[in-house]
Amino acid sequence: QLPNVVSREEELALKAIQTTYQVDDRYNAVTHSFLQSCVEIFRDAPVTLLREHYRCHPKIIEFCNQRFYNGELIAMTTDDGEKDVLQVIRTVPGNHARGHFNKREIDVITQEVLPECAESESIGIITPYRAQAEAINQAVGKDIASTVHKYQGRECDTIIMSMVDNYPTEFSDDANLLNVAISRA
């Protein structure tokens, strides 16, 4: 579960409340998801990892399993010999991002990636940033892109991930965000 996305203004307001009323940091909605707060507050409560995974192709969940779960997950899906279940497509070198928007990535998605996925039953595009999702939806003429946070709990046969940033940032390089993003397919 990902923590909330809050504006700088909301963060400052929450910080003021936390300071004024001496609220324990475990309740910090900026840095903690509800689940994280519960785990920290109820330290003696039993925690259960749901190990059986039914969503992703085994090759995709194996990446997440090794990177984020210390090999504890059990893939319950089958590998039917599909090729290229996890691909990385890089745009041309250069500084194409402008804030939370990357036109070059949108061009590559619409002109190169989506035509390759035409036979897929369901396609979703995820990105860390709302501005990028809105621009992608406008470019493709339908509502198929959303933020990683809003995609939690959803899945598609094909997921395209638009990272936007030219270089990793504290936000886009977050391990929880990457885990949720990768495991949507």
Regions found by a protein language model. Give the residues of each.
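Conserved helicase motor core of SF1/SF2 NTP-dependent helicases
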Residues: Q1-A185
